[in-house]
From Swiss-Prot:
Residues 1-29, 62-83 are annotated as: Disordered. Pfam families: PIRC1_2. Microtubule inner protein involved in the attachment of outer dynein arms (ODAs) to dynein-decorated doublet microtubules (DMTs) in cilia axoneme, which is required for motile cilia beating. Functions at the initial step of left-right asymmetry specification of the visceral organs. The gene is pierce1. PANTHER family: PIERCE HOMOLOG, PIERCER OF MICROTUBULE WALL 1 PROTEIN. This is Piercer of microtubule wall 2 protein. Belongs to the PIERCE1 family. Transmembrane segments: none annotated. The keyword Cell division does not apply. It comes from Danio rerio (Zebrafish). It is found in: Cytoplasm, Cytoskeleton, Cilium axoneme. Residues 1-16 have a biased composition (Basic and acidic residues). The keyword Disulfide bond does not apply.
Amino acid sequence: MSTNEIKNDYSAKEETAGPGDSNTSEIKTSDVYKVDKNLPSRFNNPDCFRYSHKTTNPLYRTTNQAYGSKKPTVHEMPTSFNGSRHRFSEHLLKSGMYRDNGFNTMLDKSRLSRPNETSVFYDRINFHSLYHTAGKS
């Protein structure tokens, strides 16, 4: 069976099954392709992804919105899954993320205000140091 025949067969099943038919059998990736034994069920069953269709003005509809609004078919689903080890983040799952609860007592250094001047922010004329190049503001 060629790929075109598989696609035509699948699209014919899609057309005959109505949205309200609850007795229709969902086609799985393993029915069409050879899949790995450790493939997660969400990849074997593309109908588990629930898509809602929001009506938008066609004038403002982008190509990403048009492509993303379509449900995935078995032909777009992966047939193998190679999960990574979680050795890097296992200790974070047990103890939680690091959080610094320290109290900052250092003065903030800024070009706009000098450390010994606290009322500079409230003075609209002497606010910026570039206005006064000759001397101290």
